[in-house]
């Protein structure tokens, strides 16, 4: 639900190398840093809590409630083909922890968590050109502001 006097918080989520940071950086430049923007927050924390069998879920859920009561939140779930994620990891000389190597399983966990936890989210296919992705996101943010959510 959009609340007029609260700032918009845009949270970029998704598996490693799904394009979050690139999209965030270009979005910030194109919007002149007009929004509160985070690269990951509770969605990643909750997912990794499960994959790594941590016992912090209650803390993440409490923190999430606090964020949702303080901001108008838009979660941006960055997705791309698994083979592109593997290629990006290889090009960056990065490796996933053993428990995250089933990228499709991790992607499905992100999709489910975002769908279960947030009413206001957009899925961006980052296999497309960055300008196309940013324009789609700006359109969604503008709609959010114009339609009060």
PLM feature spans:
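A glycine- and Lys/Arg-enriched "phosphate-lid" helix/loop adjacent to the NTP-binding pocket
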Residues: 67-113
